[in-house]
């Protein structure tokens, strides 16, 4: 892969031994070997995926060629039935797009608040200057009506205490 000869590998090993020392050199070699292993596996994976995609593309191209060749040899009855099937499939696709379950689900989970909508319509003609003058106007207190004072029932009638039997009353 790297086209390194034995003498060059020995030279790299000696330089690594001098720079890193005998204690850190094995750890560095293991780390570099792990990186090389990961890069090789990544390259192999990418290569396999590209090969599969190319095979799939070639298969699809050959399938299209066969379909075109077979369509020219079809009888008019088969062509008519294939056209009907295509139209049915298109209408199903259109109806599915029109009744998209994700949109219906989103609509079902949406909270509609008419108060906020009415609030927005109430503030349509208000400019920032008008809002500022309204905010800086003196505070108005709401009118209060005095509430009648109601006496609790416990205070209205005095209670008479009935003698309760106690443990000292026993004969």
Swiss-Prot record:
Source species, domain of life: Bacteria
GO biological process, one term: protein transport by the Tat complex
InterPro entries (alphabetical): TatB (IPR018448)
Protein location: Cell inner membrane
Main location: membrane
TM annotation in the entry: 1-21
Biased segments, Polar residues type: 130-139
Membrane topology recorded in Swiss-Prot or TrEMBL: Single-pass membrane protein
Keywords annotated in UniProt: Cell inner membrane, Cell membrane, Membrane, Protein transport, Translocation, Transmembrane, Transmembrane helix, Transport
GO molecular function: protein transmembrane transporter activity
GO CC term (a single one): TAT protein transport complex
Region (Disordered): 117-171
Family: Belongs to the TatB family.
Role description: Part of the twin-arginine translocation (Tat) system that transports large folded proteins containing a characteristic twin-arginine motif in their signal peptide across membranes. Together with TatC, TatB is part of a receptor directly interacting with Tat signal peptides. TatB may form an oligomeric binding site that transiently accommodates folded Tat precursor proteins before their translocation.
Subunit structure: The Tat system comprises two distinct complexes: a TatABC complex, containing multiple copies of TatA, TatB and TatC subunits, and a separate TatA complex, containing only TatA subunits. Substrates initially bind to the TatABC complex, which probably triggers association of the separate TatA complex to form the active translocon.
Name of this protein: Sec-independent protein translocase protein TatB
Species the sequence originates in: Escherichia coli O6:H1 (strain CFT073 / ATCC 700928 / UPEC)
The organism's taxonomic lineage, starting at the top: Bacteria, Pseudomonadati, Pseudomonadota, Gammaproteobacteria, Enterobacterales
